[in-house]
From Swiss-Prot:
2-beta repeats lie at residues 492-530. The B chain is composed of two domains, each domain consists of 3 homologous subdomains (alpha, beta, gamma). Residues 315-435, 437-565 form the Ricin B-type lectin domain. Keywords: Disulfide bond, Glycoprotein, Glycosidase, Hydrolase, Lectin, Plant defense, Protein synthesis inhibitor, Repeat, Signal, Toxin. In the N-terminal section; belongs to the ribosome-inactivating protein family. Type 2 RIP subfamily. Pfam families: Ricin_B_lectin (PF00652), RIP (PF00161). GO terms for molecular function: carbohydrate binding; rRNA N-glycosylase activity; toxin activity. Its EC number is 3.2.2.22. 1-beta repeats lie at residues 366-401. 2-alpha repeats lie at residues 448-488. It comes from Sambucus nigra (European elder). 1-gamma repeats lie at residues 404-436. This is Ribosome-inactivating protein SNAI'.
Length: 569
């Protein structure tokens, strides 16, 4: 019996030894089943790609944190290990497959798996290694997953690396067949740069999503433009600025981007940033909670939990105020005397056009408060009743005096026009922008990646194939003004106008007159709405061949989705 017992003991010991030193790591608990999304390139079209990104955003975004109606990712402290990752399964036409792991805290690719092996970036965390691909052989890469490290491995920047369906298919093949023993880090890093931008970055920015959708539709590759690369690089800082912005969207710091020609773009407010980037998801930053009347603020600044970390409130922001027809609000003649009126004037850098927005609700220039009385003027803040110096700036550009409920209005579009207070009718003459007072020239891309256009021979607004050629017989470039108007860039006296305020009313081009039916808001859900009618621009489904544009109730359909794009692809 002793001999038998000894033999059994040795057998058990040998089995245990094999388990410890086997090819695969052992884990005491069963692997966590993370949610997943899939994208198959075999017969994919742009709509399937769009739905894939929508599904991915839905699984990555947890909770209800929002800033200016944009979803904010949860901080690491609020995410359990069992909810930490989302898996993205990619398949190409050659039936090669790879699975990416996305961290829901950063929306970034942290590892990938193929067959029975998985690969983690250098410096991977314990949470990643203990929860991802635990039933595979895990291997470490000898470089990190940030852009600097990946570009160093490739030997050049991602500005030279094409994106599109062909590049994605090749990258899936490269990742699915990668072996660390081969040591082809250059090819691996290049493939990772492609999938990171076509998955993570496209989910973060609808601007990037649109460019990739167009490349899928046209079966053409493209290289990232400098605006696209700069928004990728600045996602963290722009997320922070948005979450700490004042209620009207003014930033404390400038977000510095680049245009396609490498010219700097200084962005000082949320409205302009969204028009440029169509950012769809924000990285978590400590939130500032500001309570404002619901009837004034349409988009909440931040909705967070009670135990969220709080940012220090930005006490003051000094910016110009842009308004009707591109004029700026200024203290008349730069006169500092109490009672000096506020007027419209050509925008400049003079001190009497600089306005300081404070958290106490005051707006000051030349050391005096913007004050409501029989007219709009500046006055000693300590002399007049406090309620006459309080203002609320809405994200749609309305500036309201809460006591009276009246709003700043520019009765005429002319130099020297005195600013008045009037009942809010959501008119373009009542639209303002804090900072970024210069119009943004852009294409407006909508249904099936077609561009909003007008023909100089009539006043119709329709959709057409996007063209960057100056010889085109139609106008597809638009100037987005701070007063909320959308103007024909070749003739900025002409505005996009709804014929009425009811559903199915056509949208046309008329002379800019500061009307309510000439004011528009680019919303974070992708719609362009008219604040007065609360209806949105809609491609008439009954008239798609003619591509007629009408007003309609919001429905969430693709023919109500628009994006401002300085590059129409």
């Amino acid at each position: 019996m002793k001999v038998v017992a000894t033999i059994l003991y040795l057998v058990v010991l040998a089995i245990c030894g094999l388990g410890i030193h086997g090819a695969h790591p052992t884990h005491s608990a069963p692997p966590t089943v993370y949610p997943s999304v899939s994208f198959n390139l075999t017969e994919a079209n742009s709509n399937e790609y769009r739905h894939f990104l929508q599904e991915l955003r839905g699984k990555v975004i947890l909770g209800s944190h929002r800033a200016f109606d944009l979803p904010v990712l949860n901080p690491e402290s609020k995410v359990s290990d069992s909810d930490r990752f989302v898996l993205v399964r990619l398949t190409n036409p050659s039936r090669k497959k790879v699975t990416l792991a996305i961290d829901v805290v950063t929306f970034y690719v942290v590892a990938f798996a193929q067959n029975d092996r998985s690969y983690f970036f250098s410096g991977s965390s314990e949470v990643q290694r203990e929860n991802l691909f635990v039933d595979t052989t895990q291997e470490d890469l000898n470089f990190k997953g940030d852009y600097t490290s990946l570009e160093h491995q490739v030997g050049f920047g991602r500005v030279y690396i094409p994106l599109g369906p062909k590049s994605l298919a090749q990258s899936i093949s490269s990742l699915s067949t990668y072996k660390s023993s081969a040591g082809d880090n250059k090819r691996l890093a290049r493939s990772l740069l492609v999938v990171i931008q076509m998955v993570s970055e496209a989910a973060r920015f609808r601007y990037i999503q649109l460019r990739i959708q167009a490349s899928i539709t046209d079966a053409k590759e493209f290289t990232p433009d400098l605006l696209m690369l700069s928004m990728e690089n600045k996602w963290s800082s722009m997320s922070s600025e948005i979450q700490q912005a004042q209620p009207g969207g003014a930033f404390a710091q400038v977000v510095k981007l680049l245009d396609q020609r490498n010219h700097p773009i200084d962005v000082t407010n949320f409205r302009r940033l969204f028009q440029l980037t169509s950012v769809a998801v924000l990285l978590h930053g400590c939130p500032t909670v500001t309570k404002m009347p619901a009837y004034i603020i349409k988009m909440p600044v931040f909705n967070g939990g009670e135990d969220e970390e709080r940012c220090s409130v930005v006490e003051e922001v000094t910016r110009r105020i842009g308004g009707r027809d591109g004029f700026c609000a200024e203290v008349k003649n730069g006169d500092e005397k109490d009672g000096t009126p506020v007027q419209l004037s050509s925008c400049g850098e003079q001190s009497n056009q600089q306005w300081t927005f404070s958290t106490d609700g005051t707006i000051q220039s030349l050391g005096k408060c913007l004050t409501t009385s029989s007219s709009v003027m500046i006055y000693n803040c300590k002399v007049v009743p406090p309620e006459s110096t309080k203002w609320v700036v809405s994200i749609d550009g309305t500036i309201t005096n809460p006591r009276s409920g009246l709003v700043l209005t520019a009765p005429k579009a002319a130099e020297g026009t005195l600013v008045s207070l009037e009942k809010n009718v959501h008119a373009a003459r009542q639209g303002w922008i804090v900072g970024n007072v210069e119009p943004l020239v852009t294409f407006i891309v909508g249904y099936e990646q077609m561009c909003l256009e007008t023909n100089p021979g009539n006043n119709d607004v329709s959709l057409g194939d996007c063209s960057v050629k100056s010889a085109s017989k139609v106008d597809q470039k638009w100037a987005l003004y701070g007063d909320g108007t959308i103007r024909v860039n070749n003739d900025r006296s002409l505005c996009v106008t709804s014929e009425g305020k009811s559903s199915n009313e056509p949208i046309i081009i008329l002379k800019c007159l500061g009307w309510a039916n000439q004011r528009w808001v680019f919303n974070t859900d992708g719609t362009i709405s008219n604040p007065d009618s609360k209806l949105v621009m809609h491609v008439d489904q009954n008239d798609v061949p003619l591509r007629k544009i009408i007003l309609s109730h919001p429905s969430g359909t693709s023919n109500q989705q628009w994006i401002a794009s300085t590059h129409p692809a």
